[in-house]
Amino acid sequence: MPGPESLSSNDPASIGDYSVEGRLGKGGQGVVYLGRDRDGEEVAIKVLNDQWAENDELRARFEKEVRAAQKVASFCTAAIHEASLDSDPPFVVSEFVDGPSLQEAVAKSGPRRGAGLQRLAVNTATALVAIHRAGIVHRDFKPGNVLLGPDGPRVIDFGIARVDDGQATLTNSIVGTPAYMAPEQIEGRGIPDKVDVFAWGCVMAFASTGNAPFGADSVPAVVHRVVSAPPAVDGVPEELLPIVQACLDKDPSRRPSAKELLMRLLGH
């Protein structure tokens, strides 16, 4: 994983009881810092930006996401250590996963193969089962949100996740990454949990071939292919291909659930 960016004069030296050592990234909700706790353990600290922190509705939705994410089995994602949601600004401290994203790993070393690909498939499907069991639809499952830690893959970034209570965590607008979005997600026909299964199929195709199955060029071209064209899955290993194809069915009712997907991967 690339090292953290240096801190600027506008960045805090500490947050709560944690020292801040660098920036790990910046997203729509805020900034993620690399920090250390009092025992010297590295952590990731997400600090909400003003737009989220000062908007009661967005803040409440973020709090709901955090509470739901805390229910997800810790071996599947970056475990949340502390959620200081009443501080100014609110921040969340999670486990720091020291490893590249799947996107970075494939770009550097090429497609996954053999036992490594099988482990990736099983572990990420297990993570989706745990995420859905916690009542969450991730909505942005993609190679950049799979970290390859020393002890296995972790699914991260629930920033646009939907808590399964009938309310989207941002709005009912289309959100996600087009190359890994399901047709019904693109068309705004609702966000069932099987959008994550479709995304899993896209991610496994990418992991095994180095290419997203609907391309990664212009957004209109990708969107058209997702909705209307068959996926490009040449190069997906024979043992994985039927499962990936089932996950990439345009009709969500014909896709397996995350649990059914996992059972198929395990040979049940």
Positions of PLM-derived features:
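AlphaC helix of the eukaryotic protein kinase fold
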Residues: 47-71
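Activation segment signature within eukaryotic-like protein kinase domains
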Residues: 120-121
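Protein kinase catalytic-loop region centered on the HRD/HxD motif
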Residues: 124-136
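Activation-segment/catalytic-loop signature of the eukaryotic protein kinase fold
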Residues: 83
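Protein kinase glycine-rich loop
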Residues: 21-27, 32
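Conserved short submotifs of the Hanks-type protein kinase catalytic core
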Residues: 87-101, 105
